[in-house]
């Protein structure tokens, strides 16, 4: 293993000089050519929202949300962040809502057989075929991260990269099942979902974001539909990742989790099972359980480095992360290409240093 390097990124020259104009531009970009489609799949109707237009020789950015929310609740904060406007300009963005989770969805009748996460993964080919997307960069959170990982195992040739936030690739064990049954006697479905979405510290502190999402979930007319997606997530199968084995993700992957988040241990374990030459691990301090909501600036910066490592947006300037936050970089083995959050040599003449793990 190579020695650790310390990286400091200044915030002296912000990426966009006028924050107000940048925010206005980002909002306009999100509104221009936004289209909604309802796509029939073998496992129900999937609603997708398209922002922008397909770019030649560039993958589409496709998102899949977590339980207890739709794509707006999960990704609006990130994609409306001022610095994300540059990404929106360079890629078409497609947000997938799981069946029955979108705003205004029909409420399923009692006894409705909701698709499993494996089946939801098989709705993605229908979406890509309908929209004529030959390849994608997937961004998934929680259940959505699992769905993208499962999809990629079967359709690796269509996936150029993955950003997996709060992924738990393991099936629930007997202890988890027993604990869930016990908490089910005293906790409402909204409280159980909050425990999945946010850290214990955020919940005990009753932060603004927790209050907002608790009210949104509790008061939603779709709460019974949310529970179906929740049940499918808790019935997920083990993805059986194995480092050096046949079951692994072969594309560039960025794993993201908040420090002290409910899924921190699961993401750390997932990182230990994936190919270190293809995987980067970003642990975010002060971000809680939903880093794409609480730290959109960090997420934007990390994602831009990620797509730069894949050969896109090479001219984009990275200046958002503060000097007060240092990134400790380590590498296991040589990489075939520069990877996310990498730093070029001080002289500017050397190649970017690869990264396996970052804490910021």
Curated annotation (Swiss-Prot):
Sequence segments annotated as region (Disordered): 324-360
Gene Ontology annotations of biological process type: cell differentiation; nervous system development; signal transduction; Wnt signaling pathway
Pfam families in UniProt: Ndr
GO cellular component terms, A-Z: cytoplasm
Subcellular location: Cytoplasm
Source taxon at top rank: Eukaryota
Keywords associated with the record: Cytoplasm, Developmental protein, Differentiation, Neurogenesis, Wnt signaling pathway
UniProt keyword Cytoplasm, yes or no: yes
Main location: cytoplasm
InterPro entries on file: AB_hydrolase_fold, NDRG
Annotated signal peptide: none
Role: Contributes to the regulation of the Wnt signaling pathway. Down-regulates CTNNB1-mediated transcriptional activation of target genes. May be involved in neuron differentiation.
Family from the record: Belongs to the NDRG family.
Record protein name field: Protein NDRG2
Species name: Xenopus laevis
